[in-house]
């Protein structure tokens, strides 16, 4: 049985209507653009001179390489790749060759202007990448070319701008003129605003009396500025040292790491007052802690006054030797006994921490002199327990008269103190010889040796106790 025949449907030309209807149907499938329109498309070809973009037009759109990026002389392959979806602005609907000419950078420019105008309105920062160094500053890619003057790159003028190439930075928009295609930026303004915010937060957390570490950032005649971590505080020259100084550079240098105490935080003026000397022991307290009344100490005469002589016994510490404490004989004026610049062994007879005064005596120091060396008089104060037994240095065995192993540091410290005490005794001996000659000349008569005027030390010292004297000799032998 023959199969039935299948016939194809017949379509008449007039099934789609008139010729006008046919052209209208074709027209609906074609996209139309005007100059200035922004279109979307897919990259279909990348050449050195141009890029082809499929935007659904009767022909591909052409993006000349110079219209790909705001950067100059770029390789198209570094900007786009086949398959990329991009936006472009219509420059010319049809050039001499009938091509649709597009610009990627102009589309980016138009989009960016809207964003930048909005940021400028809100006084917010814009973020961009440094793409070029030009005369007078930098060019940033912020969707368009933004100019950042060299004077506004940092808080201080930057000489070499090359290291900024490729860096992403934030800046405030200070000038904006679309008609002139002009965008001027300021990173310094952004830094000032940011640092001000950080500074306020930091100052709110900073407490009076707090101890902080910092780095000396600059030195001026009236003090030194210390960077505490983004916020600078001032150490006034009077707070740099316990001793008198003429210039801050005598104490610190730029770059020095220092420990300071916060004296005051002025929130209204955003100023921080610091002190370096407050973190260091008061030399007066140090002297009181390391010296006892009755000790004989070395000093240097610094000033003569009608009522006596001032003697410096430590850096920043001066005491008064009253005129009545200069000599056993009657003294009319201090220079009959001492001169400025003289070295003198003096006895500490009073320490007034509250008034920051030390009373000294040259006369009593000489009266206490003995030819036999007594370390306790010259800084090696003896220690005794409640039963009156001498407390030996840590690490020293009185039974064997030997230092124990593992106490090398204690031994070195003891021997150093012993050597210093011995040195002071020798200085005192020299002073006695000098003063004996001076007294003899002044009185025009010989005087007895200073040692005859002194009594033997009382018991309980390394010099007077037989057992402890043996220890002294042993320790002195190891010094």
From Swiss-Prot:
One of its GO terms (molecular function) is structural constituent of ribosome. GO terms for biological process: translation. SMART domains: S1. Residues 36-105, 123-188, 209-277, 294-363 form the S1 motif domain. InterPro entries: NA-bd_OB-fold (IPR012340), Ribos_protein_bS1-like (IPR050437), Ribosomal_protein_S1-like (IPR035104), S1_domain (IPR003029). Belongs to the bacterial ribosomal protein bS1 family. Binds mRNA, facilitating recognition of most mRNAs by the 30S ribosomal subunit during translation initiation. Plays a role in trans-translation; binds tmRNA (the product of the ssrA gene). Binds very poorly to pyrazinoic acid (POA), the active form of the prodrug pyrazinamide (PZA); POA does not disrupt trans-translation in this organism. M.smegmatis is resistant to the antibiotic PZA. This is Small ribosomal subunit protein bS1.
């Amino acid at each position: 049985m023959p199969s039935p025949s299948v016939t194809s449907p017949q379509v008449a030309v007039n099934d789609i209507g008139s010729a006008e209807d046919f052209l209208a149907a074709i027209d609906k499938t074609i996209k139309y653009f005007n100059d200035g329109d922004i279109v979307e498309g897919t990259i279909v070809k990348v050449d050195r001179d141009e890029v082809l973009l499929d935007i659904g037009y009767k022909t591909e759109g052409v993006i000349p390489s110079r219209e790909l990026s705001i950067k100059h002389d770029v390789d198209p392959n570094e900007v786009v790749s086949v398959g990329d979806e991009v936006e472009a602005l219509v420059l010319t609907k049809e050039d001499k060759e009938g091509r649709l000419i597009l610009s990627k950078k102009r589309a980016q420019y138009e989009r960016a202007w809207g964003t930048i105008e909005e940021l400028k309105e809100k006084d917010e920062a814009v973020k961009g990448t440094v793409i070029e160094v030009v005369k007078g500053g930098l060019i940033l890619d912020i969707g368009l070319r933004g100019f950042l003057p060299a004077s506004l790159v940092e808080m201080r003028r930057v000489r070499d701008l090359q290291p900024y190439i490729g860096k992403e930075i934030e800046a405030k928009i200070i000038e904006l003129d679309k008609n002139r295609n002009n965008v001027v930026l300021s990173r310094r303004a952004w830094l000032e605003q940011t640092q001000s915010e950080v500074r306020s937060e930091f100052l709110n957390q900073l407490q009076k009396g707090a101890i902080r570490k910092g780095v000396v950032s600059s030195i001026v005649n009236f003090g030194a500025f210390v960077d505490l971590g983004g916020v600078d505080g001032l150490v006034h020259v009077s707070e740099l040292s316990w001793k008198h100084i003429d210039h801050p550079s005598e104490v610190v240098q730029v770059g020095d790491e220092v420990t300071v105490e916060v004296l005051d935080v002025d929130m209204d003026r955003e100023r921080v007052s610091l002190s370096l000397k407050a973190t260091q022991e008061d030399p007066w307290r140090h002297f009181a802690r390391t010296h006892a009344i009755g000790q004989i100490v070395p000093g240097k005469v610094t000033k003569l006054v009608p009522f006596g002589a001032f003697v410096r016994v430590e850096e920043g510490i001066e005491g008064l030797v009253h005129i009545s404490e200069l000599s056993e004989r009657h003294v009319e004026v201090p220079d009959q006994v001492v001169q400025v610049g003289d070295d003198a062994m003096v006895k500490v007879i009073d320490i007034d921490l509250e008034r920051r005064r030390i009373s000294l005596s040259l006369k009593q120091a000489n009266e206490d002199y003995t030819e036999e060396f007594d370390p306790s008089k010259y800084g090696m104060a003896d220690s005794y327990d409640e039963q009156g037994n001498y407390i030996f240095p840590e690490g020293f065995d009185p039974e064997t008269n030997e230092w124990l192993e593992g106490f090398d540091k204690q031994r070195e410290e003891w021997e150093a103190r012993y050597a210093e005490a011995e040195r002071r005794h020798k200085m005192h001996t020299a002073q006695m010889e000098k003063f004996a000659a001076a007294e003899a000349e002044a009185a025009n008569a010989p005087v007895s040796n200073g040692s005859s005027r002194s009594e033997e030390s009382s018991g309980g010292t390394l010099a007077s106790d037989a057992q402890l004297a043996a220890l002294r000799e042993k320790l002195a032998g190891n010094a």
